[in-house]
């Protein structure tokens, strides 16, 4: 039995973390977002109704759960308020159950303006950011000039700090990028409006979590993006601006490593990626079209079509090691139901030297091609199955092979978008 569970992505994001957090949250006391911003979209389907969350922890759809947005997250206060109101329209009232770290940096309009201006200037060499200001907000944090959530509590200090930062960014926007300046007065006015709505949520969230651990409360740490987008361990420079690996939890919450507990990596039964960057198993054929359509592979934040490919076992092993994973959860198994054969990449071959890579060559991904195993498809419906014994034999063989390649057990299998479409192979909180 585990007190705390970490849930993080093993690929390039979009693995289905939100559903699994939602599935496990009914038996937890806290759900914690520890990095990223509103560039991540977690899609939940409850009783057939779809809800997309970008900042608010997924577990808050349960009335007994307390949500924490910790210091590692960069927060747009305007997007946060929009999300709170969206949930209220869906009869989820969370104002007294959501706490926001006073140390979390704010994302403000000048971050978005500079993000878009940089991408425009880079042209075909653009990174492909979501344009939400995430990277510039993290830059401000590291440069020690960020406005933080706690600054909203003191209007005089807020206005003084804001003026300095707006002047700094307007100089770049006007002089270098030839863009229109951002209005200091408009930002301040808008901040003062939202301040009152979230004022009582602003807390020392590290202290809340330390007390929860002392009281042996159950905590879920909810990751955003995926391991291969980690700023240090991902496919740089086509990465996010935070640590999406296990290490990001420690710095992003103030919770020490011995209290993390069980670390669950989420992986699709195939692979997807949004935006630019290397993708060894990427497909450009009818299978790509099939996966996109059957898997509804369009970004919940940007609406962009996701690139699709076969499951990459080399990258998966890398994620297992980087994160010290306890186990895996396989999602979207049902998407593969109609395929006659299914491939798994087990190694890479360098197109120049012909060298075979069994481990993830982080610096050489542009120069490799996948080496595949071919497995028979099951050609039977698996969607909605809730017991492992009801899966087709070929599907079970596919799952067993993934376990062998990853060298960790698969404890959860998702067979559809609803929280009930889940096979639990090991007791976690239950």
UniProtKB/Swiss-Prot annotation:
Keywords: Cytoplasm, GTP-binding, Ligase, Magnesium, Metal-binding, Nucleotide-binding, Purine biosynthesis
Residues noted as binding Mg(2+) in the record, renumbered to the chain: 14, 41
Cell compartment(s), UniProt: Cytoplasm
SUPFAM superfamilies the UniProt entry points to: P-loop containing nucleoside triphosphate hydrolases (SSF52540)
Highest classification ranks of the organism: Bacteria, Pseudomonadati, Pseudomonadota, Gammaproteobacteria, Enterobacterales
Protein's recorded name: Adenylosuccinate synthetase
Cofactor(s) named in the record: Mg(2+)
Stated role: Plays an important role in the de novo pathway of purine nucleotide biosynthesis. Catalyzes the first committed step in the biosynthesis of AMP from IMP.
A molecular function (GO) term: adenylosuccinate synthase activity
Enzyme class name: ligase
Pathway given in the UniProt record: Purine metabolism; AMP biosynthesis via de novo pathway; AMP from IMP: step 1/2
Main location: cytoplasm
HAMAP family reported for this sequence: Adenylosucc_synth (MF_00011)
Quaternary structure and partners: Homodimer.
Catalytic function, reaction form: IMP + L-aspartate + GTP = N(6)-(1,2-dicarboxyethyl)-AMP + GDP + phosphate + 2 H(+)
The enzyme's E.C. designation: 6.3.4.4
Family from the record: Belongs to the adenylosuccinate synthetase family.
UniProt GO cellular component terms: cytoplasm
Sequence positions that bind substrate: 300-306
Binding, IMP: 14-17, 39-42, 130, 144, 225, 240, 304
Residues reported to bind GTP: 13-19, 41-43, 306, 332-334, 414-416
Chaperone found in the keyword field: no
Name of the coding gene: purA
Source domain of life: Bacteria
Pfam families according to UniProt: Adenylsucc_synt (PF00709)
Cofactor-binding details, from the entry: Binds 1 Mg(2+) ion per subunit.
